[in-house]
Amino acid sequence: MINREDLLKNPVEDIALSDLEKYSDIVNVFDKIYGFSSEGIVRGSKILKEMIKDADLRFLSFTANLVSTGLRGLFADLVKRGYFNIIVTTGGTIDHDLARSFGGVYYKGSFDIDDAMLKDLEIHRLGNVLVPFESYGKVIEEIVRKFLPEIAKDKKEIPAYELLWEFGKRISDSNSILRAAYEKKVPVIVPGIVDGSFGTNLFIQSQFLNFKINLFEDMRLIKDLVFSCKKSGALIIGGGISKHHTIWWNQFKDGLDYAVYVTTAQEYDGSLSGAKPREAISWNKIRPNAKHATIYGDATIIVPILAASLLS
C-alpha cells in the first residue's frame, strides 16, 4: 500500500506569460519544420495574432479540466493582458479556480495509479492530476457558505456573470481566473453553472437564502456583445458546452470572423466536440470567409506554444 504522503509530494504550479518569454520565437521553428501538425500551430498562431488586433470581441473558450493544471495561471494572465474580453467555460472551472484560490493544492500524479486505492486514500484523480478530498469539495462548500450570504444580502437576483465577479472580488490569488476577470470586468459565461460543486452548493444555500441566479441576463449580455461588435474571434480549447455556446451565439452575426480550435476530438462520430470549423460554416456559426485553424493535440502543450507566440 502506497502512503498518502508519498503521492502528495509535488504540487501542480501555475504559469504566467512571463514564463514563456524565452520561447516567443518557437513558432518560427515550427514554420521551418512545417510538416503535419506543425503547420496547424503556425497557422493558428498567425490567426490569433490577427484576431487580437482586428476583432473587438475576443472569446476565450475552454473546459474545466485544464484549470486543474498550470494553464490556470496562463488563462488568468491572458485576460489580465487584454488578449481576450469574454470567457465561456464549464462549471468545473469555477470549482477548480475557487478551490485553488483558497488553499486547495493539486498534485502531480499518473494516469495509471490504482483508483480504488486512491478512493481509500481520499484522493480524486483528474487524468494525471491528483486532487485530495480536502482540497476540493470541502473548500468550495466553505467558500460558498462564507460569501454567498453577504452577496445575497444586497442582490436577491443576480446574473451568473456578476455573481462570479463578486466571488472574484473576494479572491487575492493572482493566478485566479475569476480574480482576473473581476479586475478587467471580463464576463465569465458558464451556461452549465449548476453542473459541479459550486452550482450544487449554490442550490443548497438558495434553500435558506432569498436568492436566485438569472441566467437570462447572461444570455442578454452575450447577445448585446455579439450584436454590437464589428468582428468576433475565438480561441476554443476543447469541446462540449463551452465550445457550442461560443459558436452558437456568433451565428446571429453571421458567424465568427476568426476561429482557432485546439482539440483531441475527431469528427467521425458526429460530435460537436469533434466538429471542424467547416461544419460550423454550414450552421452560420463561422463565416465562409473566416480565417480558421484546427490544431490537434494536448492543450497543455499547444496552448503555451500559442501564448508564447503572442509575445513575439
Swiss-Prot record:
The entry's keywords: Hypusine biosynthesis, NAD, Transferase
Catalytic activity: [eIF5A protein]-L-lysine + spermidine = [eIF5A protein]-deoxyhypusine + propane-1,3-diamine
Active site positions: 285
Cofactors: NAD(+)
Pathway(s): Protein modification; eIF5A hypusination
Annotated GO CC locations: cytoplasm
Superkingdom per UniProt: Archaea
GO molecular function list: deoxyhypusine synthase activity
Gene3D superfamilies: Deoxyhypusine synthase
InterPro entries per UniProt: Deoxyhypus_synthase_arc (IPR022899), Deoxyhypusine_synthase (IPR002773), Deoxyhypusine_synthase_sf (IPR036982), DHS-like_NAD/FAD-binding_dom (IPR029035)
Key word NAD present: yes
Assigned EC number: 2.5.1.46
UniProt similarity note: Belongs to the deoxyhypusine synthase family.
Role, per record: Catalyzes the NAD-dependent oxidative cleavage of spermidine and the subsequent transfer of the butylamine moiety of spermidine to the epsilon-amino group of a specific lysine residue of the eIF-5A precursor protein to form the intermediate deoxyhypusine residue.
Record-given protein name: Probable deoxyhypusine synthase
